[in-house]
Amino acid sequence: MKGGVGLSKRSSAETALLLGALVFYLYIAWSVPYSTTDDLQWGMDQGLRWWLQGSLNSRYVGNFFAVAMCHSPLVKTLVMGLTMFAIPLLMARLAARGEERSLLPIYLASSAGLLLMPPVMWQETYAWVSGFGNYVVPTLLFLVWLLLVRRIVDRGGHRLL
């Protein structure tokens, strides 16, 4: 099934595996503590002022997510967990190129690749709420953009160059 996720055609084992991965990533997100510096500053009124004034840096979208996640543990868990689940899924969608049979193995390999990244990289991105908002969420948005570009090109509606 080209173009769609095809969840209706998945076996119950595949669906259970994907739901298990989602629960796993939500648990990891729930377990990530707030840092005692950046995350607490973003969670205070000062962090909101920084974002509204754009006075800290020019990462407006990332800072928006950092402020939202630092103000609410529920938002943090949902944004981080869903993003952690979605990045390997979108990577798999890009790599599978419409071959639904390949999606699950590629998803598992992509998840393994992300989970096995060096601890130093993990600490600066996935285990730091502000860093996650500034670096990982934009990665998800970039993957969405790539999928949209692929859909346009595959439909033949637009030429890129």
Language-model regions: role of each:
Residues M1-R10:
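Short, Lys/Arg-rich, polar N-terminal cytosolic tail immediately upstream
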Residues R10-T36:
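Transmembrane signal-anchor helices characteristic of membrane glycosylation enzymes that use polyprenol
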Residues S12-T15, G98-A109, H158-L160:
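Membrane-interfacial loop-to-transmembrane alpha-helix junctions, especially the N-terminal start
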Residues P33-W50, A127-F132:
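Extracytoplasmic catalytic-loop and juxtamembrane helix elements of membrane-embedded
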Residues L52-T83:
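Short hydrophobic/aromatic helix or loop-helix immediately within or flanking a transmembrane segment
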Residues G81-I106, L114, V144:
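Transmembrane-helix motifs of polytopic, lipid-linked glycan transferases
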Residues Y107-R150:
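Membrane-interface micro-motifs in multi-pass membrane enzymes
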Residues R151-L161:
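Short hydrophobic alpha-helices at membrane interfaces in multi-pass membrane enzymes
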